[in-house]
Amino acid sequence: MSANVQVSGQLSSGPSLPACIVLSAVSLLCFVAGFGTGAEFVRFLSFGAIFRNISGGLDGEIPLTWSEAIRNTQFQCCIGIDIGLLFLFVLQHSLMAWTAVKKNVLHVFGVLQRSIYILCTALSLQVLMRFWQPCPHGPYLWNVSSDPWSAWLPLLCALVHTISWLLIFSVLLIFDYAELMGIKQVYYFCLGMGDPLSHKSPRVARLYAHLRHPIYLELLLILWAVPCLPPDRLILAIFFTLYLSLVHRLDVQDYAYLRSQLEKKFLLFSREEASAVGGQIRKNN
């Protein structure tokens, strides 16, 4: 069975049952890999950074000064490895999103193109997390260790991170999570319905093309809202902040569309609320 099938917006007869089973299995495996890696990435960015910090530093340790750290060979090696890992992730994530590369991947894998992208992203994130080099003895940009902030600030950061992750998951669900993870493409293909994006309006398709990272502000809060900021976390935060700023490409038309949709949702909610209140009043009378 070959997955070398081009995705079109036209309705067509679906593939054979064995082909659908194989495609579905591969798509689900890629989804599981992506979902599991995403859950581990939450732990990597939040849990360790708040309650144990990403560098694993211990209370009472005296970190190096910046001048000492720059001359420290171990510190230089750790920072060099971390920067290399970040460049590797960005290279994979950006290269596979390039139009020419996407066309080649689509030519080879067909409807599994998005699933393969998710799998490769998961693998690059796993490499980043597995080989990340902490700098527990490096100079901290800030480190809250005095009472009462040493007790309250981690809790406050935990609250900010929890709300941010909940918002991220909510936005991903709103932005068609199944299509984003490559499952919907296989489902539609097996039903002979073509590309899921072809069934959406041009304005929605345009918005999706510009907003594959609909989590900009929330991720910035997660990256920077930590009780202490060691050098490795600082590099991680700066790198992802710059990358997210470059790929965040909403324009005036996208904002206008989002505003119109929010106004429609609010109007619909207001009508439903008024109808419910009116029905309750009539029932009481």
Swiss-Prot record:
Q: Which GO terms describe its cellular component?
A: nuclear envelope; nuclear inner membrane; nuclear membrane
Query: Matching InterPro entries, A to Z?
Result: Nurim-like
Q: What is the lineage of its organism?
A: Eukaryota, Metazoa, Chordata, Craniata, Vertebrata
PANTHER family (alphabetical): NURIM
Q: Which family does it belong to?
A: Belongs to the nurim family.
Q: Which residue ranges does the entry give as Perinuclear space-facing topology?
A: 45-74, 131-149, 227-232
Residue intervals annotated with topology Nuclear: 1-16, 97-113, 181-207, 251-285
What gene name does this entry carry?
A: nrm
- State the superkingdom: Eukaryota
For this entry, the protein name equals Nurim
Q: What main location does UniProt list?
A: nucleus
Q: Topology relative to the membrane, per the entry? A: Multi-pass membrane protein
Instruction: Please list the coiled coil stretches.
Output: none
Which compartments is it annotated to reside in?
A: Nucleus inner membrane
Span-the-membrane segments of this chain are 17-44, 75-96, 114-130, 150-180, 208-226, 233-250
Q: Which UniProt keywords apply?
A: Membrane, Nucleus, Transmembrane, Transmembrane helix
